[in-house]
Amino acid sequence: MTEIRLTNTKSRRKEAFEPIDRKNVRLYVCGPTVYDRAHLGNGRPVVVFDVLFRLLRHVYGEGHVTYVRNFTDVDDKINAAALARKDAGDPRSLEALIRERTDETIRWYHEDMDALGALRPTQEPRATEWIGAMIAMIEDLIAKGHAYEREGHVLFRVRSYRDYGALSGRSVDDMIAGARVEVAPFKEDPMDFVLWKPSDDELPGWDSPWGRGRPGWHIECSAMADGLLMKDLPENERSFDIHAGGIDLQFPHHENEIAQSRCAHPEGEFAKVWMHNEMLLVDGKKMSKSLGNFFTVRELIEEYRKQFAVNNIGPAIRLRFLQGHYRAPIDAARHYIEQASVKLGLWWHFISEHLDAPITDKDRRDILATSPVIEALADDLNTPLAVTYIDGLVSRLRGGIQKQGYVDAEMDDLEMVAKRARVAIEFLGFTFDDLEEHHGPVQLKRLKERQLSASADVGVRIGRLLEERAEARKARDFARSDAIRDRLQAAGVLIKDSRDGATWELEPGFDPAKLGEPE
């Protein structure tokens, strides 16, 4: 059986993964707050942990993995969106408007994540379906001295859990010293956080021992993870395998989840392994509406459908996410997504040219049994290495690279090379037969043109560099000539020399930023 190694945020080490129960491997990923369209950053954890889900199913069997990803459908942002509709004249009750908004947003979310090629989780609980379990957990925490009620609020007593801060590597005293926010007067300690808060007549609420109110954000995931992944376990085994999410959730959300859950069930471990994907950047900066680099998944899909006849840019977004390791930030600016789309189109083209017969289930099993893609993913989800392997196979099909370290004698059969490439692509979550429609010749041509026109002076800059190179060659300054050639090649410009001079074309992966300025 393939050994999976994962970086555990809790231990800060890469560890061999051994599930608690190989017949029921359990994964929990924090899902969205459903008040608006998913932005691009929301998509990265979905894609990253979709790959993990696929890997776990491959190793342990499809029927032996439980993947839970929740919907937070009770939140002040949701309330604000519903109140805005009511203020605009909608006569319906706030409860009806909230339900409509959350149902609508969940539908959008499914559409957008489907477009990114993500499998649906095994379970997708809504927080509002688990209010009773949250109240029961809060009552238990109060009874054990870990929580207290003040003015209709229930707060978690942070100092009652001695390991608070271990996940994020923070000290409670240092956090208090560095805090610059006003502390609510009903708190015993500035670090205590809300488990339950009161609701006025206008806001949604549920009856509880502390009055009508609604849950705090952190208790939701603790209750849902417990109820769906650990409910039938003995107290001393109250643990599940992997808890994952974006790095922005590490503190305070995941730290607070651990504190609540470990205090409610002190003999259990809650989650054995914690995984966090790093931030998404756009043009080297964190996404922000004020910087003008913020966009939703749906906005990108519609933009590329209208401008470039790409019916679904989602696979290109997915590939861009997979080109970087999940524990490193990645830039998903438009030109990188376009480069990924071009790459998908080339993958489809060269594989299709060499693949005549359909791939059988036995073919897939045999190929995956020895595939370097599985090896790469088993090594802490090394998706960049998996993509590089596919690139190597496609290069072989293109007649470019004749030998790679991982290519064996079997690779003399180009149809087998194509089969291996297609199986690898599909394992990473791409539907091969859809690539022609979304990233075929028409889209490839338009996107290559877009790459050229993305910067108005790209052609001029390349021309000037080639002129400098020609002058250097004429002066027999071959070091200078080679340096210019290397710069152009690094940027993704293919140069073809002839008696009449040099011509050029853009390769997949062209990056105008690497051209620099002519000297």
From Swiss-Prot:
Query: Which Pfam family, giving just one, matches this sequence?
Result: CysS_C
Classification via InterPro entries: Cys-tRNA-ligase, Cys-tRNA/MSH_ligase, CysS_C, Rossmann-like_a/b/a_fold, tRNA-synt_1_cat_dom, tRNAsynth_Ia_anticodon-bd
Tell me the cofactor note.
Binds 1 zinc ion per subunit.
Q: Where found?
A: Cytoplasm
| Cystine pairs | none
Record key words, sorted? Aminoacyl-tRNA synthetase, ATP-binding, Cytoplasm, Ligase, Metal-binding, Nucleotide-binding, Protein biosynthesis, Zinc
Q: How does it assemble?
A: Monomer.
- Any one of the GO CC terms: cytosol
CDD domains associated with the record: CysRS_core
The UniProt record gives the binding positions of Zn(2+) as 30, 221, 253, 257
Q: What is this protein called?
A: Cysteine--tRNA ligase
Motif ('HIGH' region) on chain: 32-42
Q: EC number(s) for this protein?
A: 6.1.1.16
Q: Which cofactor does it need?
A: Zn(2+)
Enzyme superclass (EC) = ligase
Q: What is catalysed by this protein?
A: tRNA(Cys) + L-cysteine + ATP = L-cysteinyl-tRNA(Cys) + AMP + diphosphate
Among the record's GO biological process terms, what is one?
Answer: cysteinyl-tRNA aminoacylation
Q: Kindly report the protein's main subcellular placement as a broad class.
A: cytoplasm
Please state which protein family the record places this protein in.
Belongs to the class-I aminoacyl-tRNA synthetase family.
Q: Which residues bind ATP?
A: 289
Renumbered to this chain, motif 'KMSKS' region spans 286-290
GO function terms (MF aspect): ATP binding; cysteine-tRNA ligase activity; zinc ion binding
